[in-house]
Amino acid sequence: MQEINRDAQTIAAVATAVAPGQGGIAVIRLSGPQAQAAVQSVTRIPGQQSWESHRVLYGHVLAGESGERIDEVLVLLMLAPRSFTGEDVVEIHCHGGVIAVQRVLARVLDQPGVRRALPGEFSQRAVLNGRLDLTRAEAISDLVAARSQRAAELAMAGVDGGIQKRITALRDRLLDQLSELEARVDFEEDLPALDGAALLEELQRVRGALQQLVKDGQVGAALRQGLRVALVGRPNVGKSSLLNRLSRRERAIVTDLPGTTRDLLESEIVLEGVPITLLDTAGIRATSDAVERLGIARSHDALASADLVLLLFDLSVGWTPDDEALRQRIPAAVPHLLVGNKVDVAVSDARAGTSGSAADIRLSASTGAGEAELVQAVLERCGALADGSLLLSLNQRQGDLAQQAADALARSAQVAADGLPWDFWTIDLRQAIHSLGEITGEELTESVLDRIFSRFCIGK
């Protein structure tokens, strides 16, 4: 990693979620040279308790000169280098909620040399001090943000160093090939001939491994970030019934009256480990009702923001010109499925579109028939169908860099096909090695690190 200026200040932040009436315990974390002194200044530790590293102390946080007890706390001291950041770290475990936590944090921030931590700054210091590699730090952030068990499992694989080990192994293979090439450039007459075909084959194998990691990362992105699926259709085709069926609760009001849903309803569910936000839109039709028109406008917005659109139509009526008009309004860039609802009362000639082809999915939102097929189709269409063999998942930054490395190796292959000298091979090979080094943090600058860690939560 390139040399980066280190901030000598001590930082402090709440490391746990803070919400009114939620959480019995909160943790305030400090890291830096003044961490121990700052906490000693604001606490009273009774008896003969010793401020030794990796010991838990009991006491109280006091309010300034008055000596008023703000809270009863436990203090955990972790001296450098045996801490998360590699610096002196002190954690104050106080009662949760909002007021007590704010008062304790304010007392800490009043101490000389202590400032409020920036988002992700604790993790950034851990990386700078060699306590974490960058991929593990990013995986910790993903673990905190995980919205499903499968996403948490993938994040934990990164925390355990899986991504770092895989990328480092691929990078080492490229470094081996680069050393062979450079040796031939400098000392070709003194060395045996290089097997260019074997070298090219090795580069292709590494490129294939990188492309697989990129593909797996796309599936992992759906597991981490979730998908937005919009339910769209004419009034009274069963959108709200399907929302309630998939949500396993009465999220939307269901009646036989068209136009019942007048606003955009959202419901969070998990399908096969993938977090899904279902968007139940207002039925799109011509109407003079001002409130309903607002809901219809939001339905159009939902079409553009969705990862997938489920266009519902009524199998008991068949495909209508209004259904076709709705299909034409779906943006070309947004995938969609035609879902025929009310299969239990379908007319014999119901069809999915003007072409006469069958609906992608036929189901009954009231009985649940066809639900499993719908779930499978949703995940397949969004590229989010993952089997148990998915062990590692690159995030967006890592995936982009892996793709850059794969593209550089493809250019190297073209150089070889053009019959250019060895030194031309090394240009793109060096770029691939550099891109992989950026994934693990070996090739990074301060500005890039700042951008990465600014996306982390405060206190992490």
UniProtKB/Swiss-Prot annotation:
Q: Give the record's cofactor note, including how many are bound.
A: Binds 1 potassium ion per subunit.
Molecular function as annotated in GO: GTP binding; GTPase activity; metal ion binding
**UniProt-listed InterPro entries:** G_TrmE (IPR031168), GTP-bd (IPR006073), GTP-bd_TrmE_N (IPR018948), GTPase_MnmE (IPR004520), MnmE_dom2 (IPR027368), MnmE_helical (IPR025867), P-loop_NTPase (IPR027417), Small_GTP-bd (IPR005225)
Quote the EC number. 3.6.-.-
Subcellular location(s) of the protein: Cytoplasm
Residue positions binding Mg(2+) = S240, T261
Q: Where is the TrmE-type G domain?
A: 226-383
Q: Where does GTP bind?
A: 236-241, 255-261, 280-283
- Which SUPFAM superfamilies is this protein grouped with? P-loop containing nucleoside triphosphate hydrolases, TrmE connector domain
UniProt cofactor(s): K(+)
Tell me yes or no: is tRNA processing among this UniProt entry's keywords.
Answer: yes
Q: Tell me the Gene Ontology biological-process terms attached to this UniProt entry.
A: tRNA methylation; tRNA wobble uridine modification
User: Where on this chain does K(+) bind?
Assistant: N236, T255, L257, T260
What is this protein's function per UniProt? Exhibits a very high intrinsic GTPase hydrolysis rate. Involved in the addition of a carboxymethylaminomethyl (cmnm) group at the wobble position (U34) of certain tRNAs, forming tRNA-cmnm(5)s(2)U34.
Q: Which family does it belong to?
A: Belongs to the TRAFAC class TrmE-Era-EngA-EngB-Septin-like GTPase superfamily. TrmE GTPase family.
Q: Which HAMAP family match?
A: GTPase_MnmE (MF_00379)
Q: Write the protein's name.
A: tRNA modification GTPase MnmE
Which lineage? Bacteria, Bacillati, Cyanobacteriota, Cyanophyceae, Synechococcales
- Gene label: mnmE
